[in-house]
Amino acid sequence: MESNVRVRFAPSPTGPLHIGGVRTALYNYLFAKKHNGTFILRIEDTDQTRYVANAEQYIIDALEWCNIPFDEGPGKNEKFGPYRQSERKELYKEYADTLIKTGWAYYCFDSSEDLDAHRKGHEAEGKNFIYNWHNREKGRLINSLVLTTEEVQTKINAGDTYVIRFKTPQDEILRMEDEIRGKITIDTNTLDDKILFKGDGMPTYHLANIVDDHLMEISHVIRGEEWLPSMPLHVLLYKAFNWTTPKFAHLPLILKPVGKGKLSKRDGDKLGFPVFPLEYTNEETKDVSRGYKEDGYFSDGFINMLSFLGWNPGTEQEIFTLEGLIAAFDLSRVSKSGAKFSPDKASWFNQQYMQTKDNTELVNLYTPILREKGISKDKSFILKVVSLIKERAVFVNDFWELSNFFFEAPISFDAKASKKNWKEGTTELMTELISVITNINDFSSENTEKEIKEWITNKEIGFGKVMQPLRLSLVGKLAGPHLFDIIAMIGKQETIRRIENAIDKL
């Protein structure tokens, strides 16, 4: 049974992939791998009016960066292809025709003006116009339920524009099961007759989705909560075709950090965080939207963070490798209620992953930043720097702020720290310290610390009177790694030069 698990991620190429979409892909991927199943990418491009040319490649690039590759999809193991719905449109017409022949669908020739008039007429009476059993065979509606077969054929032959609607059954209580939300019951009398095939010759999402899921042998439909209202129609379509219905699981929304509602790009722009996995450039406006990759997030930390937006393992553990997530993931642990996004938590995850990264990997990421600043140092030196600062970093982009003093002397000194720590007598102490440092032969961190502290002890003064001005001289502020590690790294001559510079300026 487990090897028959087949799930799909089916985004529409209408723009960049939102992190909510990435989470849907991730949950599908985790579920598939947990059950030794297949993860499929299908591009649902039936809405040609909203199609964006570079969106499909963006989706594929995003999944690749997130390390959640698809097993089947465009250009890969196309056993059930093609995997773009626009390349399957002839197929859908056959299935729409089948529904008409079996009485589950009908032709509608109403123009948009006709429908607007019906809506306004109903609104004038304080009613909502719903195209369903209540009025589809009454009044002035023009469809194959009120026209004769000859009249319908005449209209089709004349090239009249038509849509095909699903004929929702009347007076039926539909009982459904969702893997996350449990039992769902709905009265079919409350449903409208959705369009299955549009006037432009393309199917709607509903028909194409069901046909493709059946033909691609999808066993579980794991998708966002926004599709929950479509579940009754989709279940009825399976019934109409006499096909086995897959199991459904509707994921909770990702909510904005502040206030109520679904997380949007506007929230990210307002609060200063990305909502897309990769940077995205709008080809029309040339507007650039930030991406988690370009903002310095590690893909594995990003995925770990996303996994907890709606799911938890039932333990206190928060840090998981991808393999760990696969082993722990279970739909029964997915929440029904929305998950509030936290930019701070996203940063926290990145910081946790920073500590687990191999220093060599971090050096490779930091070296281009140094190169842009015109700094060239051997790899072993940068490796030592990274090992000293990474515990204080959230992003690799933080490295320069945390380590610039290893590469260049400070050009200014923190005013508040200078006022507090460079007092009367400090210049004399620092001048004497230069002599002490000059006479140190073993300039290792341990030995330098030992000799300078012995000198301070012998002078019977507080350590702070020397250590704080010394750190200020070398770093420019009262921050940074262990002071004597800095001294050992920059060397004797540079240490002396910086103290002399501080004496001169302070």
Summary of predicted features, one role per range:
Residues M1-N128, P229-A240, G301:
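N-terminal Rossmann-like or analogous alpha/beta NTP/dinucleotide-binding catalytic cores
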Residues D61-E64, D97, N304-S307, A327, ...:
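Generic alpha-helical structural context detector
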Residues Y107, S111-D267, P274, V288, ...:
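Active-site cores that bind ATP or allylic diphosphates and position pyrophosphate for catalysis
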Residues N242-F413, V475-L506:
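Catalytic adenosine-cofactor/nucleotide-binding cores of aminoacyl-tRNA synthetases and other
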Residues S418-A479:
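C-terminal accessory/binding modules appended to enzymatic or scaffolding proteins
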Residues E2-V5, K34, L207-I210, P274-Y280:
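Active-site-adjacent bridging/hinge elements
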Residues N28, I59, L99, G103, ...:
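Residue-level signal for inorganic ion chemistry
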Residues V7-P13, I40-D45, M216-V221, E284-S289, ...:
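Glycine- and acidic
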